[in-house]
């Protein structure tokens, strides 16, 4: 594993006292740029799996990510502080930035989905959250076009795939023989 490989170097960033899954994927460069998205920095993540990656120059966003990094570095897992600056404007684009679980990310996703007027498009590796599915189902009933792509190997009795499909939402399984690892939800208001 990657952990086993790193442990042999005995660097201080290898924690032996952790439990659970740390699934963050971000990098802060010089306190003014960030990279973030669904991509794991592995050969498969970069060359075989479908992923997305955002590269953004913003010292305010970098401050948010630096605070999250420091929480993790200090061992504050699952109970950190709320994000410093949840609303950040970069040029003409307004970003909302949250970290889970402390910022209640699912609530923010549901709020945005509820605002959709014409369409919701989503791609997700794993989709088990009933509340987010409920928000999509309600928008579908309001004649908002809802379409999604989900990782085929993650479709199970725990996933929301069958629920959405049975309700008439256009949801498909991906066809990448590796992983469709995208995580994105897009809604349109006109």
Go through the PLM ranges and name each one.
Residues 123-125:
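Glycine-rich anion-binding loop/nest that anchors nucleotide
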Residues 128-130, 155-156:
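Active-site environment of divalent metal-dependent phosphoester hydrolases
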